[in-house]
Amino acid sequence: MKIGILDCIVRWNSFLQKPFMTGRERRIYERVLLGLQGRQPLDIFEYGSGFSTLYFARFLRSRNVRFHVHSVEHNKAWHLDIKRRIGQAGLGQEVTVHLSEFSPGCAPPKTPAELNYVNMPRALGRTFDLIVVDGRFRRCCLEAAMSCLKPQGIVFLHDAERTFYHGPLGRFKHSAFIDGGHYYPFEPRQHKVWLGSLDNGHLHHYTG
């Protein structure tokens, strides 16, 4: 079986328990977290659980930032794996991983589980300092994020180079596309991160 460069990167990142992001994307995420730390305890919501859930929770803890992350995942086996790793890392008090199980597809969310996934931050009845959109139904999740984001809060959209996700972006008062770099030299795909906010006009400070 032929293994491509990205396959090798995915396997290596999994071995290291690092998020599937470019190095530049991780640094942008870290700068956003540090820029928000004055609002402790940070309330964070994440669409799509993974090694990023674990990695950035460890990052915050290593800097003595008080926080709580709510993360929702649609794949039960992956959810259980990440939940186990979070427990092993001693992060069970800081990270809550929710499951809303459904089979992935291309259609808009329709089933109760799919709608529950999109509306999870609303159902929690709170507003968030940071909402990370990196899972299923990203357009719908961006729209849902608007109603549960604190005025100075930030939405972080991964894979923002995909124009299919751009529909709701204009509804945010402030926004910034940031170069996310590449996974490897000469990679044809140019990765981007998008940051959006209702009332935070300093998003370009995170370009770095």
Please describe what each predicted stretch is.
Residues M1-L130, R136-K150, I154, A160-G208:
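A short alpha-helical cap/connector motif
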